[in-house]
């Protein structure tokens, strides 16, 4: 059985960060639903797998909300355009991290928490780990500092299950056309992102399911 966030300890919760530090998370508070997140590099097939899972759950009678980060609120849509559009020019790594976490805070307040409190299953395409991997490891910022910022933005809400779709950057690049600003960041950037995702999964224990994403969607 997947452990529920509503049984979190009432005090602070911490786990090891990707570079050996501690990622501190405050209590997530009561919630009745189930929170599932898909993570992975660009080109891993997250959107396809999110849709397949949601269809399967709905066919079994579950009330499912599909969402994504960034961009699933009005504010998030503005932020998504800023951080992904090649026309945005040079954005400093710290500014980028702050923008992604602003999206995250609004997304949790407006979309995720209300749905969980209604008892719904929330399936999100990206969440905190993407911010740690991309804006932390990818942009060579402190992973622990980015993790703490994301924990503050989300009030420490931890998914019940994180599905990490793992694909090597070369294979992922072959799948992508019309690349956005993040997808065009370069091979070394995407290698750091992948390595950090795998490190987060290794340290995160039973909450993670790592799935090789070199396969087709049906496999």
Label every PLM stretch briefly:
Residues 35:
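Walker A (P-loop) ATP-phosphate-binding motif of ABC ATPase nucleotide-binding domains
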Residues 1-29, 52-54, 170-219:
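NTP-dependent small-molecule kinase module
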Residues 126, 130-196:
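A glycine- and Lys/Arg-enriched "phosphate-lid" helix/loop adjacent to the NTP-binding pocket
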Residues 38:
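Hydrophobic anchor at the beta1->P-loop junction of P-loop NTPases
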Residues 43:
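Walker A (P-loop) phosphate-binding loop of P-loop NTPases
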Residues 49:
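Hydrophobic positions on the alpha1 helix immediately C-terminal to the Walker A/P-loop
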Residues 46:
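Conserved lysine of the Walker
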Residues 62-154:
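ATP-dependent small-molecule kinase phosphotransfer cores
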């Amino acid at each position: 059985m997947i452990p529920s966030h509503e049984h979190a300890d009432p005090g602070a919760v911490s786990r090891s960060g990707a570079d050996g530090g501690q990622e501190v998370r405050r209590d997530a508070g009561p919630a009745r639903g189930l929170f599932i997140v898909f993570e992975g590099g660009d080109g891993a097939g997250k959107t396809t797998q999110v849709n397949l899972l949601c269809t399967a759950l709905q066919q079994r009678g579950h009330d499912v909300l599909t969402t994504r980060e960034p961009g699933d609120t009005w504010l998030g849509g503005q932020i998504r355009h800023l951080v992904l559009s090649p026309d945005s020019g040079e954005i400093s790594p710290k500014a980028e991290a702050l923008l992604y976490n602003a999206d995250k805070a609004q997304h949790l307040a407006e979309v995720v928490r209300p749905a969980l409190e209604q008892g719904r299953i929330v399936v999100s395409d990206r969440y905190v780990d993407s911010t740690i991997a991309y804006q932390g490891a990818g942009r060579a910022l402190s992973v622990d500092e980015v993790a703490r910022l994301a924990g503050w933005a989300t009030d420490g809400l931890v998914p019940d299950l994180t599905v990490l779709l793992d694909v090597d950057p070369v294979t992922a690049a072959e799948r992508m056309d019309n690349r956005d600003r993040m997808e065009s960041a370069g091979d070394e950037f995407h290698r750091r992102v992948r390595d950090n995702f795998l490190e987060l999964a290794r340290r995160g224990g039973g909450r993670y399911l790592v799935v090789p994403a070199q396969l087709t969607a049906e496999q």
